[in-house]
UniProtKB/Swiss-Prot annotation:
Subunit text: Component of the F-actin capping complex, composed of a heterodimer of an alpha and a beta subunit. Component of the WASH complex, composed of F-actin-capping protein subunit alpha (CAPZA1, CAPZA2 or CAPZA3), F-actin-capping protein subunit beta (CAPZB), WASHC1, WASHC2, WASHC3, WASHC4 and WASHC5. Interacts with RCSD1/CAPZIP. Directly interacts with CRACD; this interaction decreases binding to actin.
Upper classification of the organism: Eukaryota, Metazoa, Chordata, Craniata, Vertebrata
Source species: Artibeus jamaicensis
Name of the protein in question: F-actin-capping protein subunit alpha-2
Gene Ontology cellular component annotations, sorted alphabetically: cortical cytoskeleton; F-actin capping protein complex
One term of GO molecular function: actin filament binding
Length: 286
């Protein structure tokens, strides 16, 4: 073990540490970070070499953050990254600094929005917030309006989590939806992600995702937003139902097949007659 440690360069150690951090289960970033910190035993090397991993984790996980002085949380995503460690809150038209290690937002400042698409963005956001409030008690959503390859594009992100460390499980839902504002019809592209970690009597993770494509009729802002939410709701309901049904199937068939219902003798022990069995006599004599 000592020989292996001597063979690893600082660069290799940081690369391994960064992988652990990026793949930390939802709600367990601090635990993984502290374990990696002990293993590496070099805080400066960890902070400097693995800083990109802290950022990547928050971007991948759609980490929600509360900005002081503002009511609603905003998601940390690649779509809101405006550079230099700053992120966009499109609803409040501000940008802010974000500390990826402490997960804190500071220094909020006004930020000019894409005026040409803002009315579309606002309509979608209003409809999406109502949907999230109804379906995700702990949900947070952020809607962006951007010009991508010359096309006005709406990007909607949803995050909802339950962290139950006392009960040995944590889980997070993420979904991302995109469509361009084009006459008549457009294509909606979505990706749905679920990640759950259970670790009381073992170490089990569910990591699942599903890609979605559908067509959307584009009319005015409000009506288009309503039709968009119908697509989101149908797809997310179907996905969650399928996950639940698969788990029920595994519980009824797959997991039961992993163990015998009866011992090798194909006979259940009658505990009331245990003393008449040879093992009972041996236990009594012991």
């Amino acid at each position: 073990m000592a020989d292996l440690e001597e063979q690893l360069s600082d660069e290799e150690k940081v690369r391994i540490a960064a992988k652990f951090i990026i793949h930390a289960p939802p709600g367990e970033f601090n635990e993984v970070f502290n374990d990696v910190r002990l293993l590496l035993n070099n805080d400066n090397l960890l902070r400097e070499g693995a800083a990109h991993a802290f950022a990547q984790y928050n971007l991948d996980q759609f980490t929600p953050v509360k900005i002081e002085g503002y009511e609603d949380q905003v998601l940390i995503t690649e779509h809101g990254d405006v550079g230099n460690g700053k992120f966009l809150d499109p609803k409040n038209r501000i940008c802010f600094k974000f500390d990826h290690l402490r997960k804190e937002a500071t220094d909020p400042r006004p930020y000019e929005a894409e005026n040409a698409i803002e009315s579309w963005r606002t309509s979608v956001e209003t409809a999406l917030r109502a949907y999230v409030k109804e379906h995700y008690p702990n949900g947070v959503c952020t809607v962006y309006g951007k010009k991508i390859d010359g096309q006005q594009t709406i990007i909607a992100c949803i995050e909802s989590h339950q962290f139950q460390a006392k009960n040995f499980w944590n889980g997070r839902w993420r979904s991302e939806w995109k469509f361009t504002i084009t006459p008549s019809t457009t294509q909606v592209v979505g990706i749905l992600k679920i990640q759950v970690h259970y670790y009381e009597d073992g170490n089990v993770q569910l990591v699942s995702h599903k890609d979605i494509q559908d067509s959307l009729t584009v009319s005015n802002e409000v009506q288009t937003a309503k039709e968009f939410i119908k697509i989101v709701e149908a797809a997310e309901n179907e996905y969650q139902t399928a996950i639940s049904e698969n788990y029920q199937t595994m519980s009824d068939t797959t997991f039961k097949a992993l163990r015998r219902q009866l011992p090798v003798t194909r006979t259940k022990i009658d505990w009331n007659k245990i003393l008449s069995y040879k093992i009972g006599k041996e236990m009594q004599n012991a």
